[in-house]
Amino acid sequence: MTLNHRVPTGVISLDENIQGGLPGGSMTLVAGNPGTGKTLLSGEFLHHGAELRENGLYVSLSEGRESFLEYMRRVGKDMTSPPASDHVDILDLLTVKEAGIDNLMEIILERIEEGGAERLVLDSFSSLANAYPEAIDVRVSLHILSKLVRSIGCTTLLVAEIPSGRETIGLGLEEFIVDGIITLRRRTRNGDMLRELEITKMRGTEIGQPTQLFTLHGGFNVLPPFAETPITNPARFRHIPDQPERLSTGHEQLDSILGGFRRGDTILIELGEDIPSLILGLLVGTMRANFITGGGGVLMIPPGGESVERITRLDERFGLTEEERGRLLRIAVMRPEERPPPYVINVDPDDIKKSVRTWDDEKTRLLATTGKPILKIAYIDKAYSLWPMEHTKRALDVESMLTKAEGGLLVLLVRPGSEDLARHSSNISGAHLSLTNEQGVILFRGIRPRTQLYALEMNGDGGYPRLRFTPIR
């Protein structure tokens, strides 16, 4: 085993987490219950090796050659076409188990040497281990295999099945011989399925995160913690047209997921702990940009601690101009600058009636100026911190009814600690969305309408910041 030489698995965020890949010539156990993605991870490992012109050997002891090929084909990895067909050898031993376990090991060792394998997958090692009458025989054979692959620098994955209903590997002896152990799990969270990868052992490796989330959407993909992505070739936000009965979210993917929002709808976005401000900026900022680039007005109450300057900086990244902001945007603040820009309005933190009148006056001006429905965005826990709960609820009820008549959108955002207000807001909302933080990965789901779980990542390919919604499957 060569600690300084790293063999990338091809799963980018996994490789980044283990110093660039598996130690060269190492032997790693990949364990999990049925359906957790063990074979897919192993196939990605071999396919990526083929892309690097490294020879690989897949030894099938459980499902057979055709099942493996079809499984990989479904995620866009054709193992029968170059480069995989040139560099990956598939040894199907399902039909020759009757030859005896010693003969099986001899066949495997010969094929490794003949093909000059640099990557090896044994799927599954559990099937091989169960064929031995004694546990000591498993250890002896594993020692022989380990000695060979290390001597030729062949990096090996041993796939092990954890029986359904159990969480431990259960084979015992081999866990002391292997250099690394990666365990794949599924768990349920608020009715949604999450997939987790845990690295419990990786000899000679600094592990960034012991546990990572992953998805099987489009292959085996480990989800990175949310991070800002640089924008190359800046461009103006591209407006997404509205439909006769529905308004665009400003996100093509989110429009596909939700079908847009009904005209006149109130939308509640419930926020969990530790949601980065950039996520919120991209989610509602994109809605804001879509309204403004379509000539519609936007009226908003930002969250506490969010400056007008930060909001306008994001608008500039969308390509919005100062003229557009002055004409189409109104940001309500409690204590504005001495000479605020034209898009900043003052609301009185001590007088809810006066604040509502100011809000209504600006809304009337925007409706008259644009001749179009407007987008209203409010962080309602900020209002609750200033005004009595019953007054805040009454103001929300009235604004929700007015929004239906106006045909625009009212987006309400609520942070943890305002559960009573969140329940009330959910009752008046046509759509209820949720954002949570799980190990640094920001998860999105629709509560109403019900959607599957998505991981959010920043995408700057189009010339301006956008969110990418990756299904958790």
Q: Where is each model-derived feature located?
A:
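Pre-Walker A adenine-sensing motif
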Residues: T9-G21, T249-F261
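Loop/turn-to-beta-strand initiation segments
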Residues: N55, H87, G116-R119, S151-V159, ...
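Phosphate-binding/switch loop-helix module in NTP-utilizing enzymes
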Residues: L93-R150, E338-M401
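Phosphate-binding/switch region of NTP-binding enzymes
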Residues: T155-G219, G408-R473
